[in-house]
Amino acid sequence: MQCPYCQHTNSRVLESRSSEGGQSIRRRRECLNCKHRFTTYERIEFVPITVIKHDGKKESFDASKLLRGMVRACEKTGISHQRLETIVDDIEAYLQQRPQREVTTHEIGQLVLKYLREENEVAYIRFASVYGRFKGIKDFVETLDQLQEETISSPMSQWSKSSTRDRDQSQTSPCLSLTHNGSENSR
């Protein structure tokens, strides 16, 4: 490793640590020539993901651009910025694990909608309106109707409608709840 002070190429590692949740290694080094100490980081270099836009143009995947779009859709919905960053990280990790190095904006939009559907219906509609390029009220109404139909027919909504009534009639512990996959989970 080249010393940033004297440009000498020999240094010794004094200390190594895992950082950024195991995604990088931090190394403390000392130059063997000038004795200055400096820090280096070793990170995994991912193969870039190429995004194919609606018009066919291609550009590199930009997680910060995706985050900005989600932040705009989620303003005043109560979803924390940290949660949005986690969602973007999850989407990026999913895309990195795929063997395909190209992804369409449609696929990315579907992934975002899947997450936002679980987080907040208002954020879901806002994002869908931009991503889906809504042209008028009819597009909003169709999406709202579809969202309402999915909510009514989902197992969770059926459980939540009957759970209040059942809880009043039984002696079940209020700490027992259902997770998204329908299995019991105690908090």
From Swiss-Prot:
A zinc finger (unnamed) spans 3-34. The keyword Kinase does not apply. Residues 152-162, 170-187 have a biased composition (Polar residues). Disulfide bonds: none annotated. Keywords: ATP-binding, DNA-binding, Metal-binding, Nucleotide-binding, Repressor, Transcription, Transcription regulation, Zinc, Zinc-finger. InterPro entries: ATP-cone_dom, NrdR-like_N, RNR_NrdR-like. GO terms for molecular function: ATP binding; DNA binding; zinc ion binding. Pfam families: ATP-cone, Zn_ribbon_NrdR. Residues 1-21, 152-187 are annotated as: Disordered. GO terms for biological process: negative regulation of DNA-templated transcription. Signal peptide: none annotated. Binds 1 zinc ion. Residues 49-139 form the ATP-cone domain. Its cofactor is Zn(2+). Negatively regulates transcription of bacterial ribonucleotide reductase nrd genes and operons by binding to NrdR-boxes. HAMAP family: NrdR. Belongs to the NrdR family. This is Transcriptional repressor NrdR. It comes from Crocosphaera subtropica (strain ATCC 51142 / BH68) (Cyanothece sp. (strain ATCC 51142)).
